[in-house]
Structures are given as C-alpha cells and as structure tokens.
Amino acid sequence: RDLHLSIRRQRQMCIRDRIQILDFEREIFALEKQIHDLVSLSHMYDSVGDITEEISKLKKKLRKMKHDVYSNLKGWDKTMVARHPDRPHMLDYIQHIFSDFFELHGDRHGGDGPSIVAGPAKFADLPVMVVGHQKGRNMEEKIARNFGMSQPSGYRKALRLMRMAEKFNMPIITFIDTPGAYPGVDAEEKGQSEAIATNMFSMIQMRVPIICVVIGEGGSGGALAIGVGDRILMLEHSVYSVISPEGCASILWEDKNKNRQAADALCLTANHLLKFQIIDQIVREPLGGAHRNHKQAAIRLKKALRTNLSELKKIGPDELVKLREEKFRKMGEVVEIGT
C-alpha cells in the first residue's frame, strides 16, 4: 500500500509540477506508470484474475531496476541527480532534523547574502549553529537566492554566526549545496576571494566541533567557504569538485558538450572523494535518490550527524584544532600513478 501511494504521489508530481525526469530514470518511471495503471485497474474491478500477482512481480522488478541503475551511476549522472530540482535543500533538512531554528541576518558590513541561510537551532536538545547554502525551489526563489551562489556578504554573515557559535560553545553544522561562489564583477569588487579565504582561515582555528555536509553540489571555493570542518560528510549522490564538468570541458577541450568525459576526469563523486580521504563518510540515500523521499533522506543524515557529533564532543578544543589542521594539511599528497 505504501508503495502504491508513493508511486501515485510521484505520478501526481510529474503531472502537476512537470518535474525533470533524468535520462537514466525513464525506464523506471515507465515501469512505475505500468504499476500505477494496474493498481488503478485492480481498484476498479475486484476480480481481475492474476493482476495482483503481476503487480507483485512488477514491484520486485522495479526495486531491482532502481538498485541496478543507481548503483552504477557515472560522474555526470551523479551530477544530474545532485542538481535535480526536487532534491531536498538546506531548509528541507532543517525542517526534518532540527527544532527551534531561528534565522539570523546581516554580515554587519551592510549586506546579508540570501544565498546563505544561518541561525541557531536545537539538534536533539543540543544547541547548535546551522549554516548552509539555499538554492531556492521555484524560479522566484532561485532568483532571490541567486541560485545558491553567494556574494561575499553571505560568507561574512556565515562567519559572524560561526564566531558567535564558538563564543557560546555551540557545535557548527554546515550544509553545502552550491555551483560555486558568485563570479560577478560586483562580487569581486566586494572582496569575494578575501571573504572565502578569511572563512577558511577562521574555521580551521575554531574551538568547537564542525561538521560539514555536501547535500547536492559542492562547487569550488563557494563550498570551501563553509566546508572546513572536523568531519566532512557527503550524501551518496552529491558531488564535490574544483569546477563544474561543463566549465572543465570548456577549458580543457573548448567543448562544453564533453561534460561526461570531464565529470569522469574530475573524480567528483562521493566514492572517489572517500577513497582520496577528502571526505570522512558517505551518507546513503533512499533508493532512487533523496529527491524521491525527503523524509527518509533526512532520517539517514540525522543518524550520521548524531554519531559524528557524539564522537567530536569527547575531544577537547585544543585537540580539535590540532586534528583539523592535520586533516587538511595532508590533503592533496602527491602519489605515483599506478600506486
């Protein structure tokens, strides 16, 4: 029954919101439509022969198909999932994971940066500071949030509140989901590179636990500005890279259509980054991706946050800073090809 309701909701979403169906998802959606039609038929007629048995077979086939497809996604496919318009954003996770969240505004230099959302909240009754990118769901929100690409004011606001968290001994949890820092001329004039560098320099020295989670896109300096922490987590189908596949293809081959080749070369998936010791943990998503089940994705992330926060709280401030510095200093070690 739950599967029937899930399929029905998915079909209604497709019709109502015209959600994006990714190329590798088309067979999955076609099979879901077939199951939905058979379920509707079974409700109309009580005696339809072996229709119940057929539905059961198709449900098993659907589960296997989802598992096979999502277990073998390449870099570009993962990028498309990470950018999926229905993928849960920071505010969705706040709703499911935290309580008593209160958004604070302003960088105290005349700006706010709405691409960054930040404020205190409670995580299982523990006061924490939550900071993250917010892309926006519809076009109006996306424009207001600048598609998750923050101006310097957003990063300065984030730093102000992280320093507040340090003052009150509150752990910091950041949610990373951005194509990158806003690259406009006005952002550069306002000190974009300085704002990012100052955040990184300051976060490495903060004497409270910091957990960073890549929930969608982790784009270059825009991600690093709130991505220096004791533990770096990535959702299974998120990506983390110095540049987008399109940008990489345009620079290396002067052909943005070589995005698949670029995505593979960038090694931007969670599995790659765990292997390279850039991140510490992969948080598995519900079968079919987090965009299919926001609540279940949040439950899994909450469990991972609870485990990591419990471990970090046992470490003293001096040791936290020392371990964090060592963690980032050893990144990017040169190795011989083939070793």
Predicted regions and their residues:
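Terminal peptide-recognition signature
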Residues: 31, 74, 130, 177, ...
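Short, conserved glycine- and acidic-residue-centered signature motifs
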Residues: 7, 151-154, 266
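Single conserved hydrophobic/aromatic residue that forms the stacking wall/gate
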Residues: 1-15
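Short hinge/gating elements
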Residues: 79-82, 143-147, 288-291
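Glycine-rich beta-alpha loop segments
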Residues: 71, 100, 110-112, 118, ...
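Conserved catalytic cores of soluble enzyme domains
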Residues: 176-306, 310, 314
